[in-house]
A protein has these predicted regions:
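Conserved beta-strand elements of the Class I
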Residues: 110-113, 217
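Reductase modules of NAD(P)H-dependent flavoproteins
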Residues: 2-3, 141, 148-257
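Ferredoxin-reductase
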Residues: 2-85
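Ser/Thr-glycine-rich phosphate-binding loops at phosphate-binding pockets of nucleotides
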Residues: 115-121
Length: 257
């Protein structure tokens, strides 16, 4: 029995010349938790060429969605960026990952800290009703170089608050904090610097990080992961695992290149 399903591309959207989103059909046997990633790819010379991708879509949706960078000489992304509606993509049948609420201890506030395509798993998490039942407040932080790379900005700010089922919870409980490093924008700076200086908390009118109340998920570049891990551990946060819940979790299966 194959470890993969063949799915058909339903839509493709290019945010910039370096970033794109695509959706595919979803095999009815595909099961995952919000925050999971899976292996996806293309057949090249009859062999699967695969990489780990977080699933953007929520686990109750009838399609799958992924967010990808474009690497000109990347073995997979150099090909994947040219996919069109109707093309076939291979999707792994065994999603996994550490960015699950189950791996966090109970708390009042959940911080979702991302850079670049690290936003992807958090898009499914903020569309999960259980997220808002588990936490009083959810803070989505997305750091990018240029403002056009703020994928899903309009979905988060305009469409989700109007969502038929989630709109009320999202309107009351979700805070969105986009930041840009290389262009003029209302919030500028690296996520780590904005946290270390306290500016992020001032901007959001929130108290400083407190292990008694706050829980954190992190997905992004290797440097950002390490810097935030150090920052949190200095504040006595303990990292959670699949076997022992903690105060923060990190997705290490991939980091954007």
């Amino acid at each position: 029995m194959s470890a993969f399903n063949e799915e058909r591309v339903l839509s493709v959207h290019h945010w910039t010349d370096k970033l794109f989103t695509f959706t595919t059909t979803r095999d009815e046997t595909m099961r995952f938790s919000n925050g999971h990633f899976t292996m996806i790819g293309l057949k090249v010379n009859d062999k699967p060429l695969l990489r780990a991708y977080s699933i953007v879509s929520a686990n109750y949706e009838d399609h799958l969605e992924f967010l990808s960078i474009k690497v000109p000489d990347g073995p997979l992304t150099s090909r994947l960026q040219h996919i069109k509606v109707g093309d076939t993509v291979i999707v792994g049948k065994k999603p996994t990952g550490t960015l699950l609420i189950d791996y966090l201890l109970p708390g009042k506030r959940l911080y979702l800290l991302s850079t670049g395509t690290g936003l992807a798993p958090f898009m499914s998490i903020i569309r999960d009703p259980e997220t808002y039942e588990a936490f009083e407040q959810v803070v989505l932080v997305h750091g990018v170089r240029e403002k056009d790379e703020l994928a899903y900005h309009d979905l988060v700010t305009e469409h989700l608050p109007q969502h038929e089922f989630l709109g009320e919870m999202i309107g009351k409980q979700l805070l969105y904090y986009p930041t840009v490093t290389r262009e003029s924008y209302r919030t500028m700076g690296r996520v780590t610097d904005l946290m270390a200086s306290g500016q992020m908390f001032d901007d959001l009118k929130l108290p400083a990080l407190d292990v008694a109340n706050d829980r954190v998920m992190i997905c992004g570049s290797p440097g950002m992961l390490q810097d935030l891990k150090t920052m949190l551990e200095d504040k006595l946060f303990k990292e959670g695992t699949t076997s022992k819940p903690g105060d923060f979790v990190i997705e290490r299966a991939f980091a954007e290149k």
